[in-house]
Regions:
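Rossmann-like dinucleotide-binding domain that binds NAD(P)(H)
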Residues: 1-51, 55-64, 68, 80-82, ...
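Short, conserved clusters of charged catalytic residues that mark active-site
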Residues: 5, 146-149, 159
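Residue-level signal for well-ordered alpha-helical scaffold segments within enzymatic catalytic domains
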Residues: 9-12, 136-140, 163
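Residues at helix-coil transition
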Residues: 15, 139-143, 169
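Short acidic/polar mixed-charge low-complexity motifs
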Residues: 16, 46-50, 74-75, 115-117, ...
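C-terminal glycine/acidic-rich active-site capping loop/insertion
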Residues: 68-152
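C-terminal hydrophobic helical "lid"/dimerization subdomain
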Residues: 155-168
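C-terminal capping/lid region of NAD(P)-dependent oxidoreductase domains
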Residues: 166-178
Length: 178
């Protein structure tokens, strides 16, 4: 489940890649389901010169950054997950004060240099709003408003997941069909 969301986020940001290379495995003793992956999206359509690496494991004792971007003029690093699930588990409801608002300790950090000086600035994420997804479906069904997300949008992600499994099994780069 987590892998599908990470792949979808990468496709939304960078586009569908020309090819994929993946290492997917069960690394827990006695494990029955994949619990580790590293996936490289090669030459994504919206940013063909960007190197996209996705990774996750259930066995991480220390958090890794959720997002890391490096460019010629700086880097951006972001830790932490969306707060909404944790908020629900703590009894908060959508629309209440601080719903989906992350702690400052996991704000994104932008590191740049200006006039030879290092400039580091923290940026909060926007508060999450999963309920907006369902509100949009309601408005679509009742008022014929357009859907913000359509079912066809999942097809590239499904194709990438299948190609990632093939790549991992065969140990090779797999081209993505159009």
């Amino acid at each position: 489940n987590l892998g599908a969301h990470v792949i979808d986020q990468a496709v939304q940001l960078f586009g569908v890649p020309e090819a994929i290379f993946a290492d997917i495995d069960i690394i827990r003793t006695g494990g029955l389901v994949d619990d580790y992956f590293v996936i490289h999206l090669l030459r994504p359509s919206k940013a063909p010169h960007v190197k996209v690496t996705l990774k996750s494991s259930y066995l991480m004792c220390e958090p890794e950054p959720r997002f890391v971007l490096h460019g010629t003029e700086g880097s951006f690093v972001k830790y932490g997950l969306d707060r909404q699930e944790a908020d629900l588990n703590e009894g908060l409801m959508p629309g209440t004060a601080n719903w989906g608002v992350e702690d400052e300790s996991i704000w994104g950090l932008l590191h740049t240099e200006k006039d030879g000086n290092i400039v580091r600035h923290k940026y909060p994420s926007l508060a999450g709003d999963y309920a907006g997804f369902y509100d949009n479906i309601h408005r679509h069904l009742r008022l014929s408003e357009p859907l913000l997300t359509d079912a066809a949008g999942v097809l590239p992600v499904i194709r990438l997941i299948e190609a990632a499994w093939e790549s991992s099994k065969e140990g090779k780069v797999v081209k993505i069909g159009k």
